[in-house]
Amino acid sequence: YRPENAFEKSVLTRLEKIPTDIYESVEEGANYIACEIAQTIREKQKAGRFCVLALPGGNSPSHVYSELIRMHKEEGLSFRNVIVFNMYEYYPLTADAINSNFNALKEMLLDHVDIDKQNIFTPDGTIAKDTIFEYCRLYEQRIESFGGIDIALLGIGRVGNIAFNEPGSRLNSTTRLILLDNASRNEASKIFGTIENTPISSITMGVSTILGAKKVYLLAWGENKAAMIKECVEGPISDTIPASYLQTHNNAHVAIDLSASMNLTRIQRPWLVTSCEWNDKLIRSAIVWLCQLTGKPILKLTNKDYNENGLSELLALFGSAYNVNIKIFNDLQHTITGWPGGKPNADDTYRPERAKPYPKRVVIFSPHPDDDVISMGGTLRRLVEQKHEVHVAYETSGNIAVGDEEVVRFMHFINGFNQL
C-alpha cells in the first residue's frame, strides 16, 4: 500500500481516478493532513493574506483538529489569519440547540485556537424558511468576497455524500437547503438521540462550492467507509455517489487508513495491477474471487479462466489450473470442522484447531451484545456441547443503541404487565 517509487505508484494506482494515500493508522493520516493545512496557513501568513478553510463536523476530521490544536499550543501555529466556513448545518434548529454541527466544530477546534470570532461563518439553522434562498445566496457571496476557499476538508457519508450533498445532487449545485435521506438521518440520530429529534433537512455547501476550493482533502477511516471509497476513487462519476465528483478536481486528495482501503483494487485484488508475491492467503483470496467472477466451483476452473482474469502467474507457479484448484480446494476443506475447539484424541495435522489441551478455555470477543449469537451461534453451541469453558467479552454495553423514549415506553409496559 506504500509504493517505493513513482513508477511503482503509477502502476499500483492506475485504476484510481483521485490521488489516494493509504496510512497505517488514523493518527498518521490525520497528522499528515494537519501538516498540509498548517503549511498553507503559514504560507498565507507570510504573504499577509487570509487562509480560507471550509470545515465539517463529524468524526472523520476530529484527529486532524486535535493535531492542529497541538500544533497551535506547542509549535506556535496561529489562526489569526484564518477564515473558517462551516460546511453545513442541520435545519431547523432552536436557538438553544446544543447538537448543532457548529457547536461540534467549536468543541473540536475553534474554541481551542486563537481564531478571531469575526472570521467564523456558519449557516444559521434557526432562520425562517422564506429567507433561506436569499441567505444561501449571500453565504456564497461571502465565500467569494474572501477570494474563495483555499482548503476544503471533507468526510464521506454512508451513501457517498460530501457535506450533505446527497445522491442526486448536481455538479453545479451551490449552498442550499436539502432534505436528508433516511441513511443520513439515521447517522445523525446518534447526535440527537432519536430519529424523531433529528432535523429533516440541512443547509449545506453545494458540490460546485466545494469543487471551487483550491485544494480538497477527503478523509475516511474504518472498514465501514471501504465500499464508498472504492466507488468514489475507482468508480465512474455519478450523481448517485456525489463524492465521485472529486474526480473532476485537479487538486483533490484522498487520505484513508488500511481498513478504509480494503476494497481498492491494489489492496483487494493486487494481481490486476501488478505482479504479486504469492502466499497461501493471497492465492486463496484470488481463487475465491475468480470463482465468484466466473460463477464456477473451484475444481471447474480452467487455464483459460486464469489467463483471462489476470492470474496467469499462478499457472506459471503451479504448472496448471488443475494443480492450483486441488491445492486450494484441500486448503479450504481443512478449514471446515464440526469441532471448533479441536477434536480430542485425533490427528490434528490437517485440522484448523489443535487437539490438545482439552477442554480449552475459550474467550469470544463480541463488538456488541447479540453479535456473538447472531454471527456464530452454532459455533458457540458446539463449543459448549463439547465441554469447553466458554466466555464472551462484550466490547460495549449497547445501552446507547436504544433511545431513551424506547426505554421509558418498555418500562411502562413492564410495570403495566406486572400489575395484571
Each predicted region: which residue ranges?
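N-terminal glycine-/serine-/threonine-rich phosphate-binding loop
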Residues: Y1-V52, D347-R351, K356
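Ligand-binding beta-strand-loop-alpha-helix segment within the catalytic cores
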Residues: E4-K17, L77-I151, E277
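ATP/nucleoside-binding phosphotransfer catalytic cores, i.e., glycine-rich phosphate-binding loops
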Residues: F7, S208, K214-L314
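Glycine-rich N-terminal segment of FAD-binding domains in flavoprotein oxidoreductases
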Residues: E43-E74
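Glycine-rich beta-strand-to-loop/alpha-helix junction loops that act as flexible
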Residues: L55-S60, L154-R158, W221
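Short internal beta-strands
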Residues: N81-E89, A220, H253-L258, H391-E395
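Class I SAM-dependent methyltransferase SAM-binding "motif I" and its flanking Rossmann-like core
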Residues: A163-V207
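Active-site rim/loop-helix segments in enzyme catalytic domains that contact anionic ligands
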Residues: G310-L420
